[in-house]
């Protein structure tokens, strides 16, 4: 049987790397979305209310 280097790591290192990459993408995407919403809100000034 062939043992991987660091075989005591547990799950497949490639699978762990994939999970880390997906989590990083999710966090960056949510931060980017919040930043874009903030910039768009600044760009559009609030219109004064008309009675």
Swiss-Prot record:
Main subcellular location: membrane
Keyword Transmembrane: yes
A GO cellular component entry from the record: membrane
Alphabetical keyword list: Membrane, Transmembrane, Transmembrane helix
Source organism, top-level taxon: Eukaryota
Subcellular location: Membrane
Transmembrane segments: 13-33
Membrane topology category: Single-pass membrane protein
Protein name: Small integral membrane protein 38
Organism this protein belongs to: Homo sapiens
């Amino acid at each position: 049987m062939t043992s991987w280097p660091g075989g005591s790591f547990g799950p497949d290192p490639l699978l762990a790397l994939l999970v880390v990459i997906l989590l990083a993408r999710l966090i960056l995407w949510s931060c980017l979305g919040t930043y874009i919403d903030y910039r768009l809100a600044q760009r559009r000034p609030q219109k004064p209310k008309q009675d």
